[in-house]
Curated annotation (Swiss-Prot):
HAMAP family in UniProt: Cya_synthase
Example GO BP: D-serine biosynthetic process
Residues at which pyridoxal 5'-phosphate binds: 130
Binding partners and assembly: Homotrimer.
Modified residues (N6-(pyridoxal phosphate)lysine): 104
Name of the top EC class for this enzyme: transferase
Entry EC number(s): 2.5.1.76
Protein name, as recorded: Cysteate synthase
Function noted in UniProt: Specifically catalyzes the beta-elimination of phosphate from L-phosphoserine and the beta-addition of sulfite to the dehydroalanine intermediate to produce L-cysteate.
Organism from which the protein derives: Methanosarcina mazei (strain ATCC BAA-159 / DSM 3647 / Goe1 / Go1 / JCM 11833 / OCM 88) (Methanosarcina frisia)
UniProtKB keywords: Coenzyme M biosynthesis, Pyridoxal phosphate, Transferase
Cofactor(s), names only, from the UniProt record: pyridoxal 5'-phosphate
Length: 416
């Protein structure tokens, strides 16, 4: 028995339950339409709780899932009475058990499950770091082959809390290549026989997995928040929060007003911020990310750098920002580092670079008067607990099987 259909957001064409990334008629995103219209929590430890709105048949049993708690110390510091933290990482004292320390693991588990249910044998993806680590771990747990392409800056981020399995195939790129180069190489790899592209923002399972941060918050708080803060590189997390909010609104038990997306990019690489500030649906590279590769090298949170984000596409981040009357911020390295130090000292857990950018955007919003004292606010700390994890686990670096110099390299060199 099916649980959902996939619907094109532009032409309305519907597809059955399958691992599908595109509509045959246009380039719009697909969105899952679930037969369960009300969120019924399952008796599972992690994201499997939200099986109602995950595009898989079998319930996920992973302990990895988001947690939501009401902030006291940071909230007091900022003069906020209803600040909630959505935390995805390792913090066992709060029952946060994501051992790759990033909400990207919330994407990986449903994607690998859907791949398995659809008969796929091997997945191909590009990553700036955190996504690759998450899929490598899921590959280790499931035995499903994962071919992961990362730029040199992301190689050190591909570690695991256990011995890497033979199913993980890491392909690194030499310095000078960035995340977008990795995407281009992965796109070529995915055309080889037997390979299935992970799909990025087009992957419905990936978006739904990230959307569980919003679902968990709504269930914990009892309503949707008024504001949602997150740092974005591709924008998929913001889109996921929006889509989850649409379902929560239709459910009828969590309020009717969509959370305002308040999203941040990290200077100097801020193409979506620039386009949004200019009121444009289209990103113009010569204006919005001039000298992009140099900007990316100078960016503190390098995982937030994508030269081809799903901003303009139907159902993409532009639409999400319009629908929620959203705001975007441009955060400096110094602002991120200050926010990181403040958050860690007050909340008592270490956070990753993108989360520091998100925390900085909240500080900026408070200063600018973009939130009221009593508003219900969700700050998505999308990665943290790395230092805490090292207290409990020995970490193993995943070594590249091959290193290539360009996205145009002969695929024969990869020996796949």
């Amino acid at each position: 028995m099916g649980r959902f259909t996939l619907k094109c957001l532009k032409c309305g064409r519907e597809y059955g339950q399958e691992y599908r990334l595109t509509c045959d008629n246009d380039d719009s995103l697909l969105r899952a339409d679930y037969f369960e219209k009300k969120l019924e929590l399952r008796d599972q430890p992690g994201i499997g709780r939200f099986h109602s709105w995950l595009p898989v048949q079998e319930e996920l049993t992973t302990e990895a899932g988001p947690i939501t708690y009401k902030s006291e110390a940071l909230a007091k510091e900022l003069g906020l009475s209803n600040l909630y933290i959505g935390f995805s990482g390792y913090w066992p004292e709060r029952e946060a058990l994501i051992k790759t320390c990033s909400f990207k693991e919330l994407e990986a588990h449903p994607t690998m499950q859907l791949l398995k249910e659809s008969g796929g044998k091997a997945i191909v993806l590009a990553s700036a770091g955190n996504t690759g680590r998450a899929f490598a771990y899921s590959s280790s747990l499931t035995g499903t082959d994962a071919y992961i392409v990362v730029p040199d800056s992301g190689v050190s981020s591909i570690w695991l809390p256990e011995e890497p399995a033979n199913s993980i195939h890491l392909i690194s790129m030499t310095p000078g290549n960035d995340y977008t180069d990795a995407i281009n190489l992965a796109g070529r790899l995915a055309k080889l026989p037997g390979m299935v592209p992970e799909g990025g923002a087009r992957n419905v399972a990936r978006r739904e997995g990230m959307g569980t941060v919003m679902l968990d918050a709504a269930v914990t708080i009892g309503k949707m928040p008024d504001h949602y803060f997150q740092a974005v590189g591709s924008g998929t997390g913001g889109m996921s929060a929006w889509e989850a909010s649409l379902r929560l609104r239709d459910d009828g038990r969590f309020g009717s007003k969509l959370p305002k997306l308040q999203l941040a990019q990290n200077l100097p690489f801020v193409p979506m911020y620039n386009a949004w500030k200019a009121g444009r649906r289209e990103i113009i590279p010569d204006i919005d990310m001039k000298d992009a590769k140099k900007q990316i090298e100078e960016t503190y949170a390098t995982v937030l750098t994508n030269r081809a984000p799903p901003y303009s596409i139907t159902g993409g981040l532009y639409d999400a920002l319009v629908d929620t009357d959203g705001i975007m911020y441009a955060i400096t390295r110094e602002e991120a580092l200050e926010a990181k130090a403040l958050f860690e000292s007050l909340e008592g857990i270490d956070i990753l670079e993108p989360s520091a950018v998100a925390a900085a955007s909240l500080l900026k919003a408070v200063e600018a008067g973009n939130v009221e004292k009593d508003d219900v606010i969700l700050l998505n700390i999308a990665g943290g607990g790395f230092k805490r994890l090292k207290e409990d686990f020995t970490l193993f670096q995943v070594e590249p099987e091959v290193t290539v110099s360009s996205s145009e390299v002969s695929l024969d060199e990869l020996k796949i």
